[in-house]
């Protein structure tokens, strides 16, 4: 049913189906079509993507994202720029911290069993792979989604909009950020169904 409501694409060429991870990353089960990569990127560059979901390595106070350079290690941006620049909406998804983070859930609440060693939300990213300033200039909606908090880019900065049930805003979010996010009142609670091992009942 959900597959009739959306069509998932991967930069390697699959159109539709269920994208695979791990060693099978780039493939898809039951894909409707397989395009060659240049054709897939023509689709991206032409603005064919409604919603782009990408990884979250580093974010800063201006909404910039870095996925391309970390100290002496240069990962490069790959197709990241093509996908993000012409998508109608962009969502960056990943864990709130990195390096050993362990989480569990109980009774619809998130529990941080072991905090990550590295903060991902820092004052200034080392290299700008995605520009928050440019996104605001062109009116592109941007969200940053983690297991414990959701942020939104607005004209005057990054806002904390949602917090997972069971999470303390000060000690488990703000204390692990290199900047203080803006808040438009009390952040909403993320839907507790996300943190329960049962059918969500999506409509």
Language model: regions and residue ranges:
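Short internal beta-strands
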Residues: 9-14, 93-94
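Conserved catalytic-core segments centered on acid/base and nucleophilic motifs
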Residues: 1-2, 52
């Amino acid at each position: 049913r959900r597959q009739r409501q959306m069509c998932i694409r991967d930069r390697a060429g699959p159109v539709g189906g269920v994208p695979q991870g791990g060693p099978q990353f780039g493939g898809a089960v039951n894909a409707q079509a397989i395009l060659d990569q240049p054709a897939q990127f023509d689709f991206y560059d032409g603005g064919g993507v409604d919603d782009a979901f990408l990884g979250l390595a580093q974010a800063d106070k201006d909404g910039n994202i870095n996925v391309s350079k970390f100290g002496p290690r240069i990962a490069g941006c790959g197709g990241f720029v093509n996908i993000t620049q012409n998508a109608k909406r962009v969502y960056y998804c990943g864990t709130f911290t990195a390096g050993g983070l362990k989480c569990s859930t109980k009774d619809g609440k998130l529990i941080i069993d072991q905090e990550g060693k590295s903060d991902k939300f820092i004052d200034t990213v080392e290299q700008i792979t995605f520009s928050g300033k440019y996104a605001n200039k062109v009116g592109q909606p941007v969200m940053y989604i983690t297991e414990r908090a959701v942020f939104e880019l607005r004209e005057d900065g990054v806002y904390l909009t949602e917090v997972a049930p069971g999470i303390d805003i000060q000690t488990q979010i703000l204390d692990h950020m290199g900047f203080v996010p803006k808040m438009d009142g009390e952040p909403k609670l993320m839907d507790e169904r996300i943190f329960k091992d049962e059918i969500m009942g999506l409509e």
